[in-house]
Amino acid sequence: MIATNLAGNQVTNFVKQYAEFGLPYPVVGFNLNTADAWAAGEGNLGGIWPTVWHHELQTQGSKTFVANFQKKYGKIPENHAWIEYVSLMMLAQALKETKSTDTDKLIAYFESEAKFDILKKRPAYFRSWDHQLMQEAYPFTVKAKGESKGKQDFLKFGEAVPAPDQPLESLAPTRAESDCKM
């Protein structure tokens, strides 16, 4: 097994070159944005990868976001578009709830572990002690040859992790395991 810890176009370049060399070992990574996966192209990408969001997510919020994005821009949103959208939604919620733009008040609000609808099945929150966003993630692999219907349809998304009966914090180090101090 080959494990990578690359980001952005480094991942895209790596998977294209890996496919070119025809190496037989499975590849896994720690993050892959959908736009980078699409850029790698069908036939180049393999293995198992995580992502924070994808356009096939079947929640009402995600379906509405995808439909509105497609109507306005004429294409499927990749997860960076979702990140930008929900980041602004979270900030708007904090501004509304605190009725303030004061930095200390906003930090206190985020540290309160307020819940945010980020268009997934479960709400997200920022962990108070390290500011880590606790949220679901999604594994994906590549569809079998001939299954895809287009350039952006060759990824096969799995169920959310952690499982619905597991706490979101099970994806992150505990306070005892972490050196992060905020």
Language-model segments: residues:
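Extracytosolic ligand-binding ectodomains
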Residues: 1-182
